[in-house]
Amino acid sequence: MSINEVRYLPECGSTNAYVKEHFEEFGPVGAVYTTNQTAGRGRLGRTWVNAEGKALYYTVAIREPLAQPATLPLLASLAVRRQLSLRYGVECQIKWPNDLLLNGKKIVGILCEGVSYGYQQQGRGILCGIGINLAQPQSYFDAADLPHGTSLALQGANIDLTTDPEWLAEALTDFGFDRPMYVFARDGFAPFREEYKKACVNIGRRVTFDLPGGGEGSGEAVDIDEEGRLVVRTDSGEEHVFTGEVSVHGIYGAV
């Protein structure tokens, strides 16, 4: 598996939407990035606010078969974490499953989606969109109603907007996805599990999570299993959480 094309777009509505529209133009794996995304999706229905050149928006499109496609968001969070560490010397924490935090505030968001393509839409692929906050000022997060968001620049990183977006896009392509993807496509999440656990801020903390049948459960997050599920020890036993909202006490204002 190899990423065979990376497209730079001076501006687009959404890199995920662009990849969906042009999915069949890519080979087995392809990527698109921009620093001006004008019609992204705000979290929980919030209005999208364009960072106007101060953030990186990157989407990788995959139509190769994966052993565990549902765990791609976890691999993506590790891929970004590695490259931010190399470039800026920062050690982000991961809030399960795929938010990256720096000093307790969100610096990276990831959204993976399934795609149908080809004759009668019988082909199945997956795309993974990544937004990295590079140099937005505090006023951006205030206007976007994101009290728990931050940027690398606000956290003290030296950002060069003339070179950093391209460097990060190429690094994510070559070292974040291309090389690890050989292992991930064959073996799934298991080879990356220990690295992920060490970076996961949930482990050892009290969490609240959505129950499959409705309602909420709570307990201590104690592990990540080989399928990427968050293992929570509750009063009634262990729960293996894979979907739904998970609040971590002490993070994003959760108590």
Question: In which residue ranges do the predicted regions lie?
Answer:
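Basic side chains
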Residues: 41-46, 95, 197, 206
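N-terminal lobe of the biotin/lipoate ligase/transferase fold
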Residues: 1-90, 106-108, 115-116, 254-255
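Long, positively charged amphipathic alpha-helical accessory segments at protein N-termini or as interdomain linkers
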Residues: 65-67, 74-92, 102-255
